[in-house]
Structures are given as structure tokens and as C-alpha cells.
């Protein structure tokens, strides 16, 4: 019997983690130069991407309000900080996506994703390397 109670407690804790994630805000470069740093609500973030392939070190947070915010942290550092966050998942070498903001998807050689508040899809957002985990999280 104790195992069953422990299993139930684990399921309850998992559900609570989903409803109330451990990290709610993330530090980004502020729009207002008077501020040293501002904190972005992660619930508003559609995806996080890097332009490392273009020789730029900055990481961009795209929000449902079509606003971009930047961080000097590498995508891998952000991924490490968000690894316990149930809403975020790495879907390619260049993207971490907020699973709660996805409103559509196109299956092709790579998967394109549409997000709440954004008109255009993010092309090749889910690559084959990360597809199994992506599909698992949507089941």
C-alpha cells in the first residue's frame, strides 16, 4: 500500500509543478535604458531562440505580443535553468518552445510551429533529433 500512496503523491506533485512552475520570470535586457535588467514573464514567451549560426551570441525571447527581448546567456544556459519547467522543451539546436503557446503544427521533413499571437510560423522548429520527446510531451 505505501507504494501506491507514494505514486499518488508523486502524480499530485507533478501536476502541481505543471500548474505552478518553479521559475516564473527570466532576466532579460530591458527596453528602457534606465533599467539595469527587467524580468520577463515566462507565461508570455512563445519561444526562445539563438542566432549562433549567424555568429551572434544573443538569445531572443519572442512573446505573444510580438515583442522580442534579448539575453546575453547562451541557449544551453537558458535550457539548463528551465530544465525543470514543464512548459518549455528544446525542439532543435536553435529553439526552446513554450508548449502551452503552440496553436498549430505542420508535419514535413522538419516541423513548423504556429504560436499564439504570432501570424507567421517558426520554420523547422522541431527537428528529427528532438521529435520523439516533442511527440511524447503531446500525448
Q: What residue spans do the PLM features occupy?
A:
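Conserved binding/recognition cores within well-folded domains
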Residues: 4-117
